[in-house]
UniProtKB/Swiss-Prot annotation:
It comes from the Eukaryota. Transmembrane segments: none annotated. This is F-box protein At1g61340. GO terms for biological process: cellular response to hypoxia; response to 1-aminocyclopropane-1-carboxylic acid; response to abscisic acid; response to bacterium; response to jasmonic acid; response to osmotic stress; response to salicylic acid; response to salt stress. InterPro entries: F-box_dom, FBS1-like. Residues 78-126 form the F-box domain.
Length: 185
């Protein structure tokens, strides 16, 4: 298929009803629709009827219920992330910035384990900060070392220059008097 084209996959109505109810489904009449754009693809569930009124998806969002049968979409997405193998999860967490590790530590046990491994392996060596330490202080934009506003900048002290000794191309132990006589006469 060419880029930007859509492909919709649907089932016949009688097969759809049999599969939803007979295979232990909820009988919601959901069908699989697949959109292709560019190099990625999206999978979307769309209702084919008015059965959504009694569905768990239209229940009002309130307090979290501890029931495993009613899970929200956000929990389902986090569960998919937690179901990944630990090494892949560690690689994902290595892409997170250093300041966000504390928030990831409190998400779940599996993400906490992956965060600990990523912190020991990846973040122990590369811990860059978004802003420079000297430009951003605790209480706003401060100057380093409490410098007053004299419009004087602190210059870095010059490092002492190393003495460089040039090795002579002429060997001093040799007698080169014959060469100099031939050149200057």
């Amino acid at each position: 298929m060419a880029l930007g084209k859509k492909r919709i996959v649907t089932q016949k109505p009688n097969l759809r009803q049999r599969r939803d109810v007979d295979n232990g489904g909820l009988g919601l009449g959901l069908e699989f629709v697949q959109y292709k754009r560019g190099f990625g693809r999206k999978r979307i569930l769309i209702s084919s009827g008015d059965e959504m009124e009694d569905s768990i998806f239209t229940s009002p969002v309130g307090k979290k219920l501890c029931d495993d049968k009613t899970t929200s979409v956000a929990e389902g997405q986090s569960r998919e992330l937690e179901d990944l193998p630990l090494d892949i999860l560690v690689r994902i967490i290595c892409g997170v910035e250093h300041e966000d590790l504390k928030q990831l530590f409190h998400v779940s046990k599996t993400i906490r384990e992956a965060t600990m491994i990523a912190k020991q392996s990846h973040f122990a060596y590369s811990t860059p900060r978004k802003t420079s330490v000297f430009h951003h202080g605790r209480f706003g934009w401060d100057k380093p070392f409490d410098v007053e506003d004299d419009d004087e900048e602190i210059e870095a002290p010059g490092a002492p220059l190393q003495k460089r000794y040039r090795l002579s191309r002429i060997n001093r132990n040799k007698d080169d008097s014959g060469v100099s006589v031939a050149l200057f006469h």
